[in-house]
Amino acid sequence: MAKKTTKRMPKRREEYTYHGYNIEQLKAMSMDELLAIMPSGARRKVLRGFTRDEEDVRAKIAEGDGVRTHSRSMIILPEMVGKNVAIYSGKEFINVEIPVEGVFHYFGEFALTRKKVTHGSAGIGATKSSKYVPLK
């Protein structure tokens, strides 16, 4: 009996929605409508008002791509999705294309300030047994 093979279709990714709204609907909403569905931390930050630096970043992102910023505390709004932003990590600027899933998160969440530590092998004299290893 011959084995029947079926070709598996690649898993289709569903369209991202935030509280039932897709990204086009979020972009079309007014700020008051967005405030109603924002998480409380982002809502309080928006209600307090953006700083001058954050307003400048927002204006530059609206003009076009390729913005460099130190404002890690800027809230990602729906109008920023898909834009390229260089976010300062404390050492260098990290280029980030803002994903759809990043709406209402902070810029700083996408530019990490610490690297993951990768430990190497122990050096000579680090352990008692390694003292007698011949040097090359």
Swiss-Prot record:
Q: Which GO terms describe its biological process?
A: ribosomal small subunit assembly; translation
**Any GO molecular function:** rRNA binding
Kindly state which keywords UniProt assigns to this record, in alphabetical order.
Ribonucleoprotein, Ribosomal protein, RNA-binding, rRNA-binding
Pfam families linked to this entry: Ribosomal_S19
Cellular component (GO) terms are: cytosolic small ribosomal subunit
What's this protein's family per the entry? Belongs to the universal ribosomal protein uS19 family.
Role description: Protein S19 forms a complex with S13 that binds strongly to the 16S ribosomal RNA.
Q: What is this protein called?
A: Small ribosomal subunit protein uS19
Protein species of origin: Methanocorpusculum labreanum (strain ATCC 43576 / DSM 4855 / Z)
